[in-house]
Protein backbone atom coordinates (compact mmCIF):
# COMPACT_ATOMS: atom_id res chain seq x y z
CA UNK A 1 0.00 0.00 0.00
CA UNK A 2 1.34 3.41 -0.92
CA UNK A 3 1.86 6.24 1.54
CA UNK A 4 -0.81 8.22 -0.31
CA UNK A 5 -3.37 5.47 0.37
CA UNK A 6 -2.36 5.43 4.02
CA UNK A 7 -2.92 9.18 4.30
CA UNK A 8 -6.28 8.92 2.50
CA UNK A 9 -7.40 6.30 5.01
CA UNK A 10 -6.23 8.40 7.97
CA UNK A 11 -8.00 11.47 6.61
CA UNK A 12 -11.21 9.45 6.14
CA UNK A 13 -11.11 8.33 9.79
CA UNK A 14 -10.53 11.92 10.92
CA UNK A 15 -13.45 13.14 8.77
CA UNK A 16 -15.79 10.47 10.18
CA UNK A 17 -14.82 11.27 13.76
CA UNK A 18 -15.31 14.98 13.07
CA UNK A 19 -18.87 14.22 11.91
CA UNK A 20 -19.40 12.70 15.36
CA UNK A 21 -18.41 15.85 17.28
CA UNK A 22 -14.63 15.60 17.28
CA UNK A 23 -12.46 18.49 16.08
CA UNK A 24 -9.40 16.77 14.64
CA UNK A 25 -6.81 17.76 12.08
CA UNK A 26 -4.83 15.18 10.14
CA UNK A 27 -1.09 15.61 10.62
CA UNK A 28 0.18 12.23 9.46
CA UNK A 29 2.14 13.67 6.55
CA UNK A 30 5.09 14.70 8.71
CA UNK A 31 7.27 13.07 11.29
CA UNK A 32 4.92 13.28 14.25
CA UNK A 33 4.34 10.23 16.41
CA UNK A 34 0.60 10.51 15.79
CA UNK A 35 -1.76 10.91 12.84
CA UNK A 36 -4.22 13.52 14.12
CA UNK A 37 -4.43 16.22 16.78
CA UNK A 38 -7.35 18.22 18.13
CA UNK A 39 -10.16 17.91 20.65
CA UNK A 40 -12.65 15.24 21.68
CA UNK A 41 -16.42 15.90 21.68
CA UNK A 42 -16.03 16.91 25.36
CA UNK A 43 -13.27 19.42 24.54
CA UNK A 44 -10.26 17.39 25.72
CA UNK A 45 -6.98 17.94 23.86
CA UNK A 46 -6.09 14.66 22.11
CA UNK A 47 -3.50 13.07 19.85
CA UNK A 48 -4.59 10.09 17.77
CA UNK A 49 -2.63 7.21 16.27
CA UNK A 50 -4.55 5.33 13.57
CA UNK A 51 -3.98 1.72 12.47
CA UNK A 52 -5.95 -0.68 10.36
CA UNK A 53 -5.49 -4.39 10.14
CA UNK A 54 -6.54 -6.67 7.31
CA UNK A 55 -6.98 -9.54 9.77
CA UNK A 56 -8.94 -9.61 13.01
CA UNK A 57 -7.13 -10.21 16.31
CA UNK A 58 -8.80 -9.91 19.72
CA UNK A 59 -5.59 -8.28 21.00
CA UNK A 60 -4.65 -5.03 19.29
CA UNK A 61 -0.89 -4.54 18.93
CA UNK A 62 0.89 -1.24 19.50
CA UNK A 63 4.65 -0.83 19.68
CA UNK A 64 5.87 0.18 23.13
CA UNK A 65 7.92 2.97 21.52
CA UNK A 66 4.80 4.43 19.85
CA UNK A 67 2.74 4.01 23.05
CA UNK A 68 5.38 5.82 25.11
CA UNK A 69 5.76 8.65 22.57
CA UNK A 70 1.99 9.23 22.52
CA UNK A 71 1.91 9.43 26.33
CA UNK A 72 4.68 12.06 26.29
CA UNK A 73 2.38 14.49 24.49
CA UNK A 74 0.57 17.18 26.48
CA UNK A 75 -2.80 15.68 25.52
CA UNK A 76 -4.90 12.55 25.91
CA UNK A 77 -3.28 9.76 23.88
CA UNK A 78 -5.70 7.76 21.73
CA UNK A 79 -5.18 4.67 19.60
CA UNK A 80 -7.73 3.92 16.86
CA UNK A 81 -7.69 0.44 15.31
CA UNK A 82 -9.91 -0.64 12.42
CA UNK A 83 -10.18 -4.30 11.49
CA UNK A 84 -12.76 -6.50 9.73
CA UNK A 85 -14.84 -6.90 12.92
CA UNK A 86 -14.98 -3.30 14.07
CA UNK A 87 -13.39 -0.03 15.02
CA UNK A 88 -11.77 0.33 18.42
CA UNK A 89 -10.68 3.44 20.28
CA UNK A 90 -8.29 3.07 23.21
CA UNK A 91 -7.78 5.94 25.67
CA UNK A 92 -4.16 5.05 26.43
CA UNK A 93 -3.77 7.38 29.43
CA UNK A 94 -6.53 5.42 31.20
CA UNK A 95 -5.04 1.96 30.69
CA UNK A 96 -3.35 0.20 33.56
CA UNK A 97 0.30 -0.66 33.03
CA UNK A 98 0.44 -3.33 30.36
CA UNK A 99 2.93 -6.17 30.04
CA UNK A 100 5.23 -5.97 27.04
CA UNK A 101 5.85 -8.83 24.65
CA UNK A 102 8.62 -9.08 22.09
CA UNK A 103 7.35 -9.65 18.56
CA UNK A 104 9.09 -10.12 15.24
CA UNK A 105 7.64 -7.16 13.32
CA UNK A 106 8.26 -5.29 10.08
CA UNK A 107 10.95 -2.63 10.49
CA UNK A 108 8.61 -0.11 8.89
CA UNK A 109 5.30 -1.50 7.69
CA UNK A 110 5.10 0.39 4.41
CA UNK A 111 8.58 1.03 3.11
CA UNK A 112 10.75 -2.02 3.71
CA UNK A 113 10.58 -5.78 3.93
CA UNK A 114 13.08 -5.93 6.82
CA UNK A 115 11.90 -7.29 10.15
CA UNK A 116 13.23 -7.14 13.69
CA UNK A 117 12.18 -7.78 17.26
CA UNK A 118 10.16 -5.00 18.88
CA UNK A 119 8.70 -4.52 22.32
CA UNK A 120 4.93 -4.31 21.97
CA UNK A 121 1.76 -4.17 23.98
CA UNK A 122 -1.17 -6.41 23.11
CA UNK A 123 -4.27 -4.47 24.14
CA UNK A 124 -7.40 -6.48 24.85
CA UNK A 125 -10.20 -5.13 22.68
CA UNK A 126 -12.49 -5.15 25.73
CA UNK A 127 -10.44 -2.19 27.01
CA UNK A 128 -11.48 -0.12 23.98
CA UNK A 129 -14.56 1.85 23.13
CA UNK A 130 -16.03 0.10 20.11
CA UNK A 131 -17.14 2.64 17.53
CA UNK A 132 -19.95 2.13 15.07
CA UNK A 133 -18.49 3.93 12.09
CA UNK A 134 -18.20 1.65 9.09
CA UNK A 135 -15.13 2.13 6.93
CA UNK A 136 -15.13 -1.13 4.94
What are these regions (language model features)?
Residues 1-28:
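Acidic-basic catalytic patches of nuclease active cores, encompassing PD-(D/E)XK
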Residues 13, 66-69:
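A general structural detector for well-ordered alpha-helical segments in enzyme core domains, enriched
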Residues 17, 36-38, 42-56:
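Conserved catalytic cores of phosphodiester-cleaving nucleases, focusing on short active-site segments
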Residues 19, 39-42, 75, 83-136:
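Non-catalytic C-terminal interaction segments of nucleic acid-processing enzymes
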Residues 30-33, 86-87:
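Short acidic/glycine-enriched loop/turn segments that link adjacent beta-strands
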Residues 47, 79-81:
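Structural beta-sheet core signal
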Residues 54-67:
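Active-site-adjacent loop/helix micro-motif of nuclease/hydrolase catalytic cores
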Residues 70-74:
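Arginine/glycine-rich "motif VI" loop of SF2 helicases in the C-terminal RecA-like domain
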